[in-house]
Regions:
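Long, contiguous interaction/recruitment modules in multidomain scaffold/adaptor proteins
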Residues: 1-2
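Conserved alpha-helical positions within TPR/SEL1-like repeat arrays
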Residues: 5-18, 25-28, 32, 41-56, ...
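Terminal, low-structured helical/coil segments at or just beyond the last alpha-helical repeat
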Residues: 154, 159-182
Length: 182
């Protein structure tokens, strides 16, 4: 096992133990080692791991930079699933920052890639992200529409647990929109 890979493994172990600052340092070292070796794909994975740790540390601006850097590297290597994952990650950071419009833009990009790849469950996950973000914006009818889209995709994908959660969210929102019986 080469040094960069060992450093990545060290980072994973540190994350598991809750040592986020130390994990961040390990992923930064791995990212630099992979960059020096010209291995853009593994560099992008280290960059993603770094950004995920930065989210845990609530350093959102740095996390966005990390996810965007990983996105660019994954785009260069045509790793479309990883590209979509980065868009989803970017969307979630924007959502956590209270930037719903930016979140929606990123989630929509992720959704488009997953749909193009025929990955229904992952597409449905993005629909639930869009629904939740629409709910945050008080766009309740749109949120309901997106929960229903997720429900359909989860059903097609055979993802029963996620389908049940989407159905529950859609039912609660639909009931709230109908208001109390007169």
């Amino acid at each position: 096992m080469d040094t960069a890979e060992k450093t990545m493994q060290e980072g994973y172990t540190l994350v598991q133990s809750g040592s986020h600052e130390e994990a961040l340092e390990a992923f930064l070292r791995a990212e630099a080692l992979y960059a020096a070796a010209g291995d853009g794909q593994r560099q992008a994975r280290a960059c993603t791991n770094k950004a995920l740790v930065l989210v845990q540390l609530r350093r959102f601006a740095d996390a966005l930079d990390g996810f965007r850097a990983a996105l660019g590297l994954f785009e260069k290597s045509d790793e479309f699933i990883r590209v979509a994952e980065q868009y989803g990650n970017i969307g979630s950071v924007h959502r956590d920052l209270g930037q719903p419009d930016e979140a929606l833009e990123s989630y929509t990009e992720a959704l488009a890639v997953y749909r193009e790849l025929g990955l229904r469950e992952r597409a449905a996950d993005q629909c639930t992200n869009i629904a939740y973000t629409r709910f945050m914006k008080k766009e309740y009818e749109e949120a309901l529409r997106w929960y229903r889209e997720a429900l359909s995709l989860y059903t097609q994908a055979g993802s029963e647990e996620k389908r049940a959660l989407a159905a529950e969210n859609a039912a609660r929102l639909a009931a709230a929109l109908e208001g109390p019986p007169e």
